[in-house]
Amino acid sequence: MVRRKKSKQACSKGLNQRLKEDRISQFYESLLCQILNYLPTKDVVKTSVLSTRWRSLWLLVPSLELDSRDFSDFNTFVSFCDRYFDSNRVLCINKLKLTISENEEDGFYLKSWIDAAAKRKIQHLDVQFLPQFHKIHFNLYKCEALVSLRLFEVSLDKGRIFSFPCMKTMHLEDNVYPNEATFKELISCCPVLEDLTVIIYGMDRKVFQVHSQSLKRFSLKRVSSFLHEVALSGVVIDAPLLCSLRINDNVSKSFIVNNLGSNDKLDLSILFGLWHFDETSVTSMRSSIDRFLPGILSVMEMTIHSPAFMLMYRYLALIPLPHLPKFSYMSRLSVTLGVSDLQFLPTFLESCPNLKSLIMESNSNSKRMLLNGNYHINFSSVPKCLLSSLEFVDIKSSILVYVARMKLVKYFLENSTTLKKLTLRLALRLQYCSAKDEIVKKLRKFPRISKTCQVGIVFD
């Protein structure tokens, strides 16, 4: 009797212990789904073996991320997805990411999956094809609840009419569009679109047009390694609410940008399809640059990369000083350049009469010039902004050899009448060596035309 009583007590104690250990299973279903939503899908599915309570719980998780490479073979992946999207237990799909690494010509499976997701009011869709461009015919036009869309290496169907009344974010990377109208329609059918990223396959020869009354941020990348073999069409951007524009394009020969305002930010790396920047080459593209510049002259902040800087300098050098186009609203300029480009900086700054802040960084040619000892620079003029508006100069001197660096610092200290602070950023390794002391001594000897100017050295 005593032994039986002890046995019951032991069983009761073990049961209580298990209940304590599995308190998470006592949570409300909605809370469990929220917890599972933070886990990778393959781990979420594994919870189905924990107990009867957990067997179908993963089907209620509103986010799904599936990669065909996580399955033993592609047929197993398709079979799993078919069962999932056909399940009556799946009531809501908020977010779906599909990564597919097989080249199935018809893509029959994807159409039914997207249809199923559309019926469940999917809001975030990400489809990636890894091996190559994939020709599919899935019904994007049915996904009217979409808020964000990402397509990677997808070949879109011809003649579809899209409607995305809720779409705010779109990322289109290396996709194939059957014609120019399809791309244009895809963008213009999003009346509340705010963020757009477009990465274009370098050899695509279409004119890409972005017309949007709601777009606020746009990033475009169109790059090819075979510049000498291409002669591609251009880009048209018309977005009156745009406040941030980033263009990295070495292929397009024509750019038209409308409606950039005085509060906008511009990140520019464009070559107008040129391989060389001699006077003859730049002159050949002058009409295209003439059409492009008026659309960006009102920007407040600009980042310009080399060799786009050299292209713009060569263009500006063709124009008499009184007729030089002016970035009158620009207050902040960040420029990437090499030692050989420094002598052209004053000419470029002539176009920025109200500039307040200037940041300079290096390009990959600077180290090569250091090894060659080729760093002769000569500043021939003092632009207006140095005499009336420039307040902050930040020189990231990994860009420069010692002589060039000190010439640049001396130039700004001697000529910037309104300068408040000049920051010289040095490599961290110089912090504890004698070169640092030599630089400090030099800086103290340089005359400063601005009595309020402070010089700071930062090691990073």
Swiss-Prot record:
Ranges for the F-box domain? 21-67
Which SUPFAM superfamilies does the UniProt entry name for this protein?
F-box domain, RNI-like
- Which domain of life, per UniProt? Eukaryota
Which SMART domains would you find in this protein's record?
FBD
> CDD domains annotated for this entry?
F-box_AtFBL13-like
Instruction: Tell me which Pfam families the record gives.
Output: F-box, FBD, LRR_At5g56370
> What Gene3D superfamilies does UniProt report for this protein, alphabetically?
1.20.1280.50
All residue ranges annotated as the FBD domain in the record: 375-426
Q: Which InterPro entries match?
A: F-box-like_dom_sf, F-box_AtFBL13-like, F-box_dom, FBD, FBL13/AtMIF1-like, LRR_FXL15/At3g58940/PEG3-like
The protein's name in its UniProt record: Putative FBD-associated F-box protein At5g53640
